[in-house]
Amino acid sequence: PSRLLLQPSPQRADPRCWPRGFWSEPQSLCYVFGTGTKVTVL
């Protein structure tokens, strides 16, 4: 299965979605699927 990363996004950079990555933010969650579909939940 794809590796799912759960890490705080860099404060110096804006919230972004990374391929096959999972970013958890205080006010937003960014889900990235292998299909390239990006879903941002604010």
From Swiss-Prot:
<keyword id="KW-1064">Adaptive immunity</keyword>
<protein>
    <recommendedName>
        <fullName>Immunoglobulin lambda joining 1</fullName>
    </recommendedName>
</protein>
<comment type="subunit">
    <text>Immunoglobulins are composed of two identical heavy chains and two identical light chains; disulfide-linked.</text>
</comment>
<keyword id="KW-1003">Cell membrane</keyword>
<keyword id="KW-0391">Immunity</keyword>
<keyword id="KW-0964">Secreted</keyword>
<keyword id="KW-0472">Membrane</keyword>
<keyword id="KW-1280">Immunoglobulin</keyword>
<dbReference type="GO" id="GO:0005886">
    <property type="term" value="C:plasma membrane"/>
</dbReference>
<dbReference type="GO" id="GO:0019814">
    <property type="term" value="C:immunoglobulin complex"/>
</dbReference>
<dbReference type="GO" id="GO:0002250">
    <property type="term" value="P:adaptive immune response"/>
</dbReference>
<comment type="function">
    <text>J region of the variable domain of immunoglobulin lambda light chains that participates in the antigen recognition. Immunoglobulins, also known as antibodies, are membrane-bound or secreted glycoproteins produced by B lymphocytes. In the recognition phase of humoral immunity, the membrane-bound immunoglobulins serve as receptors which, upon binding of a specific antigen, trigger the clonal expansion and differentiation of B lymphocytes into immunoglobulins-secreting plasma cells.</text>
</comment>
<dbReference type="GO" id="GO:0005576">
    <property type="term" value="C:extracellular region"/>
</dbReference>
